[in-house]
């Protein structure tokens, strides 16, 4: 067993994926070679069994680390505001809030009244047309700020947890 934090585990996963890509590239480049009939072939240094076993070994480590992270995320609660939430529920909630924040951001940037653009169909109309918002702009702005603040507090709690909470990973 090895002790890791989520932050460290993600760095290890990045390294393992880089290593795996190295062996996948080696496999891709070493599978075949071209040689002219009248010259000595230059055979790439490639051993299927060695490369395949390295890839399988790396994949096994990745599975163990990701499983440990998933268990930690599903079973450990973090205080966020005045409630406790599991890490995985925080991640889901943050995704929901970020989508809502994008909608509210678009709404809060609208003008209360805008003139419609003239186009081919509007060219014959004498009176200009206006588009009006159908909501309270200040309320939307406040809701945007509230959601932004909620996301920030979740992110801070999550960052602290990821940097400090240690868990066991099977080696």
Regions found by a protein language model. Give the residues of each.
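Structural preference for solvent-exposed beta-strand-turn elements
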Residues: 1-171
